[in-house]
Amino acid sequence: MQEKVTKNTFLYPKGYEPDCIIPSEYCSFRFALGKQGQNPLVAICMNPSAARETLSDRTINRIINVSKELCMDGWMVFNLYPERATDATKMDVFQQELMDRNIQEIEKYLVENNIKEVWGAWGNDSNIDMLIKGKEQVKDMLSSIGVKVYYF
């Protein structure tokens, strides 16, 4: 896993450290990372990289900064596919079981927290199979529970 994930990490902005990490231990995948709030910015990115409990990465810090600019009181990041890789082309083979758990974690959070809109922060269209499959499945789930996705 180490060779797939950047060593370039950063501190979280003070007061914006995560209090929700699934799974809590650092491993080759991550379903959720964020700081709970009553009005959080919820972003769905491509796939996770290096961010963990004590160290952030560029993408996470950008999302935190957007949440601050929008006066949100929290931030939560999910991904189209949960495998850690700074370069998505280095991910392993698609695993439907991992994807099913990913969808389950996203849906559970959105429903339990009455989230009605998310930021689709997954970047440009990718030709990477697991991201294509992940995007289709995530968008289908969001539609089924009435959550709007904003992306550009």
Spans of features found by a protein language model:
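Glycine/proline-rich loop-helix segments at beta-alpha junctions forming the active-site rim
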Residues: 85, 91-152
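Glycine-rich anion/phosphate-binding loops
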Residues: 54-62, 95-102
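A generic structural signal for short, non-catalytic loop/turn and secondary-structure boundary residues
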Residues: 24-26, 71, 144-145
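Short, well-ordered beta-to-alpha junction loops that form the rim of enzyme active sites
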Residues: 45-46, 80, 122-124
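Short amphipathic alpha-helices and their capping/turn segments at secondary-structure boundaries
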Residues: 30-36, 55-75, 107
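Active-site and ligand/interface coordination hotspots across diverse enzymes
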Residues: 1-57
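Residues at the starts of beta-strands that form the adenosine-phosphate
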Residues: 40, 73-74, 117, 148
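Short connector loops at secondary-structure junctions
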Residues: 73-89
